[in-house]
């Protein structure tokens, strides 16, 4: 199978990071003063973000030492005490993982990348500083997508993608808090521990499994509707990320009455499962550039589930070869078919353009 080793590494790395983030979520919330930092853009970042990024990048480097990584976080400005907290959480997670969830013949560390010291942690985090680009292959990582949801005790996701020559070829998303019965579906046995993992390789379909197992994979597909009035939208919780007022205007124009609001790329997973039909993320300002790690893993999962993923104004595919950001404006993903997706995008474009009319 194409990218077989890469898929194994991505799945097990996301799985282990999902376990850690689920385990420490309540602790991070209870001790925000010591576990959470505010970045320069006023967004929060937690011990969990850094620990998850460290686990995943170390797994990548241990198996593909020459591969580059575009990661969201940097170790710049972190105190030794904070980095020590990251390492301690990783060690505590190792004990739980090795006892209950370890898979044979998989290495998260090796002699070159032992992950034992504070300097090891800093080095691994900063391997995520690659700028991306049009040529070659690199991994794209958001260790906790939806940090504000994580800090509310709600939905978040661990997201990893492999991009080759500007095209996402593999995506893996861990959703540690996802309970499908909350969205009208039946849950799979074993989801209670730490949710689900969704994954896809381009050309090979999209699948999901309880994270506790990650061996029994069920193929998934979007649902196709004939009328926008029957659609359910997927939207974020935070108003700082997308224009909720304009998204409401789009829904009114298309006679869409049902919406689900949740953080993170878990929205892409619900779309791929056929539990909703269109993901709206309209830019608050046209100058805003989406980060590739917020959409890369979801891109290939939606595509392989039969969906469509474009910008919100010109109806063009998202370009993941532009560096660390997308050049296009806004994001819309839908279950299709093409004519309905085009209608949603054209309506979105009209609404966005009317703000300056």
Swiss-Prot record:
**Per the database entry, which stretches of residues form a coiled coil?**
none
Q: Which residues form the signal peptide?
A: none
Q: Which SUPFAM superfamilies match?
A: Carbohydrate phosphatase (SSF56655)
Q: Which reaction does it catalyse?
A: 3'-phosphoadenylyl sulfate + H2O = adenosine 5'-phosphosulfate + phosphate; adenosine 3',5'-bisphosphate + H2O = AMP + phosphate; adenosine 2',5'-bisphosphate + H2O = AMP + phosphate
Out of the domains of life, which is the source? Eukaryota
The UniProt record gives the binding positions of adenosine 3',5'-bisphosphate as: 147, 241, 264, 267, 281, 294
Listed binding positions for Mg(2+) 3 are 72
Cite the PANTHER family for this sequence.
3'(2'),5'-BISPHOSPHATE NUCLEOTIDASE, PHOSPHATASE
Please give the name of this protein: 3'(2'),5'-bisphosphate nucleotidase
Primary gene name? MET22
């Amino acid at each position: 199978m194409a990218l077989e080793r890469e898929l194994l590494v991505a799945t097990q790395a996301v799985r282990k990071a999902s376990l850690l983030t689920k385990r420490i979520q309540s602790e991070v919330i209870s001790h925000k003063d010591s576990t959470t930092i505010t970045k320069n853009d006023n967004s929060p970042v937690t011990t969990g973000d850094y620990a998850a990024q460290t686990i995943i990048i170390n797994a990548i480097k241990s198996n593909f030492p020459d591969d580059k990584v575009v990661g969201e976080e940097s170790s710049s400005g972190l105190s030794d005490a904070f980095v020590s907290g990251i390492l301690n959480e990783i060690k505590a997670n190792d004990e739980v993982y090795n006892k209950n969830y370890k898979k044979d013949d998989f290495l998260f560390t090796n002699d070159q990348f032992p992950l034992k010291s504070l300097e090891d942690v800093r080095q691994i985090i900063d391997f995520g500083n690659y700028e991306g680009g049009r040529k070659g292959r690199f991994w794209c990582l958001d260790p906790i997508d939806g940090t504000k949801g994580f800090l509310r005790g709600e939905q978040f996701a661990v997201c990893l993608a492999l991009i080759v020559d500007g095209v996402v070829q593999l995506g893996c998303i861990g959703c540690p808090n996802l309970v499908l019965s909350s969205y009208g579906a039946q849950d799979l046995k074993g989801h209670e521990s730490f949710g689900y993992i969704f994954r896809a390789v381009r050309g090979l379909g999209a699948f999901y499994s309880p994270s506790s197992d990650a061996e029994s994979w069920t193929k998934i597909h979007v649902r196709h509707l004939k009328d926008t009035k029957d659609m359910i939208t997927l939207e974020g919780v935070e108003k700082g990320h997308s224009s909720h007022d304009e998204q409401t205007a789009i829904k009114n124009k298309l006679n869409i009455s049902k919406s689900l609001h949740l953080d993170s790329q878990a929205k892409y997973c619900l779309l791929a499962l056929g539990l909703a039909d269109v993901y709206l993320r309209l830019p608050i300002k046209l100058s805003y550039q989406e980060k590739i790690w917020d959409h890369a893993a979801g891109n290939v999962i939606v595509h392989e589930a039969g969906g469509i993923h474009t910008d919100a104004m010109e109806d063009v595919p998202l370009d993941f070869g532009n560096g660390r950001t997308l050049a296009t404006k806004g994001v819309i993903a839908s279950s299709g078919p093409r004519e309905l997706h085009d209608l949603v995008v054209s309506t979105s474009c009209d609404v966005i353009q009317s703000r300056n009319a």
